[in-house]
């Protein structure tokens, strides 16, 4: 949607099978949370806005086997996990006043409270709340129902096609960018 409206877009994509067709989209493919962190850090300085919509793993295995782990006599296998770097928090910590940072939250309980907490912790300008509690919304549907939360409050949107939801989000982003430009 951003590219369709004329923006130059850098898409940092994990291992997905989606094609990127628009000439205004430069795609950077990554395979790990560490690679996504590095690419995000490298691109953010020159960006007017960043939309963080990827569900990046919060943890990674402490050790990675280079061969198949065979089943022995043990019925259990213990994996030790390490936290990955928090991409959103790191960008929020270096965000300039002339940049926007947009996050997403998928919540199933305490939706408002959890989204507001994430908004503050990550220094987002606004956060898009997705709920799995609404019929026809979320994964496996062509529709979604969102709320946009900022420090002033919450705007709820009705169930719409995902293309319409994208337009709503970019409308809000565009309005915020115009406001930044007028006040700088």
Feature locations, PLM:
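Glycine-rich phosphate-binding loop
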Residues: 31-105, 109-133
């Amino acid at each position: 949607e951003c590219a369709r409206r004329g923006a130059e877009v850098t898409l940092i994509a994990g291992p997905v099978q989606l094609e990127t067709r628009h000439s205004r989209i430069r795609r950077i493919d990554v395979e790990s949370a560490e690679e996504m962190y590095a690419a995000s850090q490298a691109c953010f300085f020159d960006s007017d806005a960043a939309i963080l919509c990827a569900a990046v793993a919060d943890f990674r295995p402490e050790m990675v086997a280079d061969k198949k782990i065979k089943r022995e006599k043990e019925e259990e296998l213990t994996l030790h996990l390490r936290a990955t770097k928090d991409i959103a928090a790191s960008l929020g910590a270096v965000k300039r006043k002339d940049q926007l940072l947009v996050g997403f939250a998928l919540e199933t309980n305490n939706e408002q409270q959890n989204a507001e907490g994430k908004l503050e912790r990550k220094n987002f300008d606004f956060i898009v709340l997705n709920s799995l509690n609404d019929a026809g919304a979320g994964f496996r549907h062509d529709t979604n129902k969102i709320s946009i939360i900022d420090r002033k409050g919450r705007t709820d949107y009705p169930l719409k096609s995902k293309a319409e939801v994208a337009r709503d989000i970019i409308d809000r982003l565009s309005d915020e960018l115009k406001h930044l430009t007028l006040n700088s």
